Amino acid sequence: MNAILWEKLSGSIEWAAEEFDGVMGVSIKDLTTGNTLSVNGDEQFLAASSIKIPILVELHKKAKAGTLDLDTEVTVHDDVKVGGTGVIKELGDVTLTIQDLATLMITVSDNTATNVLIDIAVMDDVNATMEEL
């Protein structure tokens, strides 16, 4: 990202943080330049659905390395289904590929798909990859 765009982005985020009625945390790193921007970056927040992007990154990393086949089928049984958003909870036992689970995790924020993919991606690996970035 060029310097002018970076300055605009930085200014917009800093303005939003000042105007926001609450506590906001944002951390950005331009992977091409190494530039970083952080507003309350040392504060801890509940991850909620924001964890879904790092999980997706880890799945992609493992697929690219050849250690994970996204076409692998996984059967999701009722005992692992959770409430909240998503469609898997409404189905009986269902067999889906890892790719399909990832698609549901991102497109409809499916919490059951997310939980299944956490086990596949391995949360320690997800955290390590995020630290590397």
Model feature map: region roles:
Residues 1-133:
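Active-site-adjacent loops and short helices of periplasmic peptidoglycan-processing enzymes
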